[in-house]
Amino acid sequence: MFSKDGLNNLMQHAQKIQEQMKKIQQEVSEIEVTGESGAGAVKVTLIGSHYCKKIELDKNTILEHDKEILEDLITAAFNDAVRKISDLQKQKMSSISSEMKFSNNLNLPF
């Protein structure tokens, strides 16, 4: 059976983690990242919620590349930006993941 103090500590700990996760989610949603391809010829800027804010094309790229290559470059830049957001989310969430491992000082029977 849980002790009253142990259960209270567990609930406080869970609430603290939940608040930290909300804060991190808010921070990540406001982050801007730019993915690039073709040595910077194509740039895609996303915000943390994976919303595409801007696509930039180097004017020389438009003139030199055909439609299919340009589409591939845009796709690669977009995927690069999505990967960067994912990496940032993992990095920020790892800061609280260790707190999710409950320590012995919670007075829990397990």
Swiss-Prot record:
Protein's cellular compartments: Cytoplasm, Nucleoid
Complexes and interactors: Homodimer.
Name of one Pfam family that matches: YbaB_DNA_bd
Main location class: cytoplasm
GO annotations of cellular component type: bacterial nucleoid; cytosol
UniProt-recorded Gene Ontology molecular function terms: DNA binding
Protein's name according to its UniProt entry: Nucleoid-associated protein bbp_426
Function statement: Binds to DNA and alters its conformation. May be involved in regulation of gene expression, nucleoid organization and DNA protection.
Family listed: Belongs to the YbaB/EbfC family.
Keywords: Cytoplasm, DNA-binding
